């Protein structure tokens, strides 16, 4: 039941469905990333260690843009698995095992340099002519719900994710606490997003590879609720405070505020009803409704340009840009 529920949640995450028809390049690497996570499990069990390099290499060759964040997600999951199998970890053992694991990822990067190096050269050579500007105020840490919830250019889950992160941060399990802290830092520190984007801009779409890690915390919390190991009242209060902080900190729209309120009401209602009657299907229905709300909002929030308004053939701006690029000897890039 837990595996089915998580599969449903993963399928209905906002970026997965949206980009499957909008920007396939934002999610086409996901199969290799998931296979990489499975290979990491085998790696720390002493099985087929070469598979980590293989799946990381294929992920990099599939999507160069998500190379940094994809490798970062694999590294975080590697530390998570290492902490899980080592009950008494030491710094010396961590350095030894971490170096051996990092070598597998570095080898994948070296193999993929045939694609990464030309792309990196293009990014660096065209940077001076770019028009991207990052305000220092955007680096101020805060509760940015856009990095986690509803948005199709981010992890794009529901408030249960916030509940899961909070639960993980206060968990007694070292590996789970580590993952919760990592997800919390990613969601509150824009400079991390800026670095994962190659210092180009602060755009949360680079966090999409962390979706499976969010699902992992999702599963831990779901399983704890089923076993009755969570104190829901304090978690509900903290989740509400975090949601309110996100609303007031980033001045969200009325529509987003409505979805946050609806999400919170549905989530808390299903949790407390489940605690009374102990029927697992109630919890599943509540989470499914939250995900459906999130996915529907994310997909309908995108405004497409009507075909009748496009002016590719007669656009003076397009012709001017094409003439300028053609007159330059160095490689150029444009913002999309």
Which sequence ranges carry the predicted segments?
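Structural signature of transmembrane alpha-helix termini at the membrane-water interface
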Residues: 15-19, 41-44, 61, 79-87, ...
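Membrane-embedded helix bundles of polyisoprenyl
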Residues: 2-84, 100-120, 125, 186-187, ...
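Short periplasmic/luminal acceptor-recognition loop of GT-C membrane glycosyltransferases, typified by
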Residues: 323-336
């Amino acid at each position: 039941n837990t595996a089915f529920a998580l599969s449903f949640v993963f399928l209905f995450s906002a970026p997965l469905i949206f980009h499957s028809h909008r920007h396939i390049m934002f999610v086409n690497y996901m199969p290799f990333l998931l296979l990489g996570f499975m290979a990491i499990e085998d790696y720390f069990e002493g099985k087929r260690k070469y598979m980590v390099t293989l799946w990381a290499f294929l992920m990099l060759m599939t999507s160069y843009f998500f190379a940094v964040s994809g490798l970062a997600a694999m590294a975080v999951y590697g530390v998570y698995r290492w902490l899980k199998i080592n009950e008494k970890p030491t710094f010396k053992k961590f350095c030894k095992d971490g170096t051996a694991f990092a070598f597998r990822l570095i080898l994948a990067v070296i193999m993929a340099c045939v694609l990464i190096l030309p792309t990196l050269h293009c990014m660096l050579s065209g940077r001076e002519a770019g028009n991207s500007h990052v305000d220092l105020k955007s680096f101020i840490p805060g509760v940015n719900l856009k990095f986690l919830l509803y948005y199709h250019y981010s992890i794009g889950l529901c408030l249960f994710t916030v509940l899961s992160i909070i639960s993980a941060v206060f968990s007694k399990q070292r590996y789970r606490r580590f993952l919760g802290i990592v997800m919390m830092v990613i969601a509150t520190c824009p400079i991390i997003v800026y670095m994962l984007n190659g210092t180009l801009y602060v755009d949360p779409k680079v966090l999409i590879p962390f979706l499976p890690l969010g699902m992992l915390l999702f599963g831990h919390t779901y399983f704890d609720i089923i076993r009755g190991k969570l104190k829901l009242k304090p978690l509900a209060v903290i989740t509400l405070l975090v949601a309110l902080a996100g609303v007031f900190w980033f001045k969200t729209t009325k529509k987003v505020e409505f979805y946050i309120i609806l999400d919170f009401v549905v989530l808390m209602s299903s949790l407390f009803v489940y605690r009374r009657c102990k029927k697992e299907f109630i919890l599943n229905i509540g989470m499914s409704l939250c995900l459906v709300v999130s996915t529907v909002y994310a997909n309908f929030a995108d405004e497409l340009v009507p075909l009748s308004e496009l002016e590719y053939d007669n656009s003076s701006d397009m012709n001017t840009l094409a003439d300028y690029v053609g007159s330059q000897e160095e490689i150029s890039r444009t913002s999309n």
